[in-house]
Each structure stands twice: as C-alpha cells, then as structure tokens.
Amino acid sequence: MFIRTKVFRNKDGSTRTYLQLVTSERVGDKVRQRVVANLGRLDELQAGSLDRLIEHMIRFSRRQWLLEKARQIEARQARTWGPVLIFRRLWEELGLKATFARLLNGTAIETDFEEAAFAMVLNRLLDPMSKLRVGEWVKTIYRPEWERLELNHFYRALDFLAEHKARLEEALYARVWDLFNLKLDLVLWDTTTTYFEGRAAEGFADYGFSKDKRPDRVQIMIGVLVSRDGFPIAHEVFPGNTAELDTFRHVVEKVKHQFRLGRVILVADRGMVSEKLLEEIEEAGLEYIVGVRMRKLKAAREVLSRPGRYRKVASNLWVKEVIYGGVRYIVCFNPEEKEHDCQIRKQAVARLKEKLAAGEVKQLIGNSAYRRYLKINGSQVGIDEHVLQEEAMYDGKYVLRTNSSLRPEEVAEAYKSLWQVEHAFRELKSGLDLRPIYHWTEKRIRGHVMVCFLALVLEMALRRKIKDLGEEVRYDDLLLDLCQLKAVDLRVDGSHYLARTELTGCAEVAFRAVGVRPPLHVTEMPRT
C-alpha cells in the first residue's frame, strides 16, 4: 500500500488535491490500483489533521509490531538474582574466595568446593533447609557457576569447612578487623545448646543442661565469640554434656593464643548462669556480666530501691551503679520502655476490672497474666494495689551484675552486645535453621555449624555497611526486596538475552552499601 495524490479541477480553473491510500492488485495479466481509503483534502490535512493521523497510525503500527515481536519472545525461566550479587561481593571482600584458593592450593576441586560452600551459606541466609535439598534449591538462584554442582560437592565442602575451621576463622578475623575497624579491647562470649532431631554422632552429641528445655534429647553446645560491637569473631562446638565454665576457660586460652586478645568477659542473659557458676568464674580469676531476674531475686528489689543518680548514656539508656552485699550491680533505665511497660499494665488492669465486674473470676485465676495482679482472700477476689505499686518499680529497668572493672556505661553497652549474640543464636537455630540437625557425623555437624557461622558473618557485614551509609532499613525487608530482583532468560529470534526485573523497595540500598552496580536491564548473551 502507498499514499497517492488525486487532483480534481474546478469549473473556475482552480484545483483541489486529495490524499488516497491505495493498493496495487493484479487482475489477470494487468496491475490495477484500488483505493483503500480517501484520507481527505491535502490542504485541510496539512493544517494539522495529517500529523494527528500519522501519529495515530504510528501508534497502531507500533502496537502491532510489538505484538508480533512478543510472539517471537520466549521467557524460559526467572530465577532469584539480587541476594547472590550482594552476598557474593561480601564473600569475596571478606577474602573467603582467596582463602579457599590458598587452602586448596589451586587444585581442580577448588572452585567446586568454594562455590558449594558459598551456596550453602546463601541457602542459610535465604531459605534454610537440609543439605539433602540444597542441590534443588540452587536451581532457583541465578549463578551459572552452580550448574555443575552435585550433591557430593556439598557434603565434601562440609568436611572441608570442618577440617579448616581454625584457618578460615583466622583469615576472616584479620580481614574483618581491617575492613570494619573492630573494637577488640574486650570480646564477649556466650553459649547455647541445640538438640538433635536426626541421628546423632555418638560420643559427641550427649545429654546435658538444655537451654532449649529439651533434656530428653541429645545435644551439642555452641559458643560464639563476638567483639564488643557485636561482630562474630569465632565459634566453638562442644559435646552436649560440657560444663559451661569449661567452655569459658577454653575460649580464654583460644583468645590469648589464636587471636592475641587480652580480655574476655563472659556475658550471659538472665537465668542462664547459676550462682555456683559465678562463684567458679570468680575463683578462676575471670570476669562476667550477667542479667538479673528482677522479680525472682530479693537483692534486685533492694538494688532498685537504693537512692542514686542515673547517668545518661544515650536517649534511651540511663545507668547507675549500686553496691549491695559486696556485689556490684548496674541499674539500666530506658524512659521509652517505662512508658510502654506502664501502658501495657494499665491495659491489663482495665481488662481485669471488666472481667471482675462480669464475674469471670475462675477465668482470671487460671490466667497467669492476670493472676499476678489479684488479691484473693477466701471468696473475695480483688485487685492487689500493693503489687501494682511494686510492678511500677520495674518499669523500663533491668539490672546487671558484674565483677568487672568496666565503667557502668561500658557494662550496659557490653550487655546490649549480648542481645546481638543472642540474636545470633536465634539466627543460628531459627532463621539460619541450625535445628533440626540431620548431619549425624561429628565432622558434618561441625561443618554445618561453620556454614551457619559464615552466614552470620555475612549478615553482620551487610548490616554494618548499611549502618555506615546512615540508612535505616529493616534487614528482613531488605532481603525480601533483593529476592524480587530476578534474572529472566529470554530467547528472541534465535538470540539469547539475560534481562532483569526492576529494583523494588530498599534493594538499591544494598547495592550502594556493598559498592556494586545493579546489572544492565538487558544483556545479550554469547551464542553457545
């Protein structure tokens, strides 16, 4: 088809020109032109309507072109891409790739072992599961280097991690100290236990004091050593029946000889350390900081009632020192938490009054959340005002006990670091899914824990880099947004392209934090 002009002569000798859309058709052995459409007078079309007509036709034409092209596009698969880009950068920046190469002496298995280890670590961070399924999980992630991995690579990588744990930790320690300027004037130590659902390594997993409250299961004990600003330095795995003091003595020697650090302080949460253990720690000349269970210890009430001025450490942390019974206590106060605790109690009391008025006494007595505020005198049940006044004394406060010479604010900050250690253990056992443990040989168990430890190091490295940017984003949200960045395998007219989806949410923060540019929207892949 084409456009032609058709000129008509008027009676007065003037002319008028029309535009026509014409097609050529063969009729017999001749070619004839057939008018498909009369578009109008040329002078009127040139006044502006011609441009509008052309624009409309181009839009219609482009849509048709795109529809035709779309029929030629084959989107074969979309795989998760964002997290592997971020954590691979951190993996290499922390020197793990180079350390693997050095330990394996450049052998042919170097890349497979290193990639298998990285895959398991990323799996712990994103989608924890048994190693028996990690071989399937890697197929959902875009990393071409993983296409050649087989199940035996993962198991052999676990063995490698167990065998070379000490050297990997030493290399990491040196690199992390340099990258993040860690405060290493003191380091903190805490332990946890984790029990077994699967078969256990005989003589390694054993019955012992269970912090998971599962004395019916064999377990192992895990300790993590962290800097005072919460960065993981090393970890140890002990048989399940190891005494806590023995783990502490072990780590003190480790710190002195392996890392050349002078001071280790045992930091423990409320209820996790017995009075007997504290006495043994002091007799051994070691230091501790432990939380006090305020409502279960008479000394805590005495300490809270002692006069003294609080010293401001931060907007949400005030501290004061109290010596009672020859023991040093640090009272910590958070004004924001005080308001929160007070509000929660007021709401509980309001509901309590409603239920008392409705005669729901039996329900209240059986509910521990309400029963603590009740005063029962024979058949008479009412609100215990004395208990309410006593509860107000605890609002926004917690008490620490220590035998260290640290300043009160340093004690409080060190205990806050414990939260990060405890968070690390929660990550190990839940988010990083240390339990249930299915690897039943001692070497595989140790390798599994090492995978979790490396995942924790990568997570803390990313958190630290984001903090250094001055950005405030929730880590879980960041991971979700990174997982939305997909690599899409496209085939167009026989050509191969790799396309990516758009960055969403706070994913771009992660790329800025680690200094990596997001991939191009579309990349033409080499022909194979």
Residue positions per predicted region:
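Anion-binding and metal-coordination hotspots
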Residues: 2-5, 11-13, 17-20, 28-32, ...
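Short, surface-exposed polybasic/aromatic micro-patch for ligand or macromolecular engagement
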Residues: 5-58
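Accessory, often N-terminal, substrate/partner-engagement and coupling regions
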Residues: 51-112
